[in-house]
């Protein structure tokens, strides 16, 4: 059983085919390198794998659970798709923080942006943000950075 199964992923921007029938399996513990020239679709593939871009075709499964099936997606705001985005992340080659933000603000930025899509966000913004900030503090504490929350 593959930990990650990517089957026939396609992505088009207008009439330009960026990804065509990309398929691979990744076993637990394996490392995968995605290599290609500038503009070859590497970043687009990664964005599709963590649901920042919606593929036009194909499936993505993790531990035999289909997380994405292009034939099942209604829109970018599909609730299930939004929920799946919360479980994926991307580590960039050049790691940067926003220097104007505190450690807590940097850690919680993505989750706060995603929270704006929640159906009850406007009514419960303060409560939702408080939960996100508590989660961010827990993450910083796990990394030994509890004393750096406001730095």
Model-derived features with residue positions:
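Short coil-to-beta microelement around the adenine-binding A-loop and adjacent beta1/P-loop entry
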Residues: 16-17, 82
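Helix-to-loop junction immediately C-terminal to a conserved catalytic motif
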Residues: 50
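Conserved ABC ATPase "signature" region
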Residues: 65-71, 108, 112-148
């Amino acid at each position: 059983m593959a930990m990650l199964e990517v089957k026939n992923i396609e992505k088009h921007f207008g009439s330009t085919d960026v990804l065509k029938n990309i398929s691979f399996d990744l076993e637990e513990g394996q490392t995968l390198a995605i290599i290609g020239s500038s503009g070859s679709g590497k970043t687009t593939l990664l964005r599709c794998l963590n649901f920042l871009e919606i593929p036009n075709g194909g499936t993505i499964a993790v531990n035999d659970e289909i997380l994405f099936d292009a034939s099942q997606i209604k829109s970018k705001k599909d609730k299930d798709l939004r929920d799946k985005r919360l479980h994926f992340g991307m580590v960039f080659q050049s790691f940067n923080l926003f220097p104007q933000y505190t450690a807590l603000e940097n850690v919680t930025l993505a989750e706060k942006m995603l929270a704006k899509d929640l159906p009850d966000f406007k009514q419960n913004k303060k409560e939702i943000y408080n939960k996100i900030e508590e989660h961010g503090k827990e993450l910083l504490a796990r990394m030994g950075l509890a004393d750096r929350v406001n730095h």
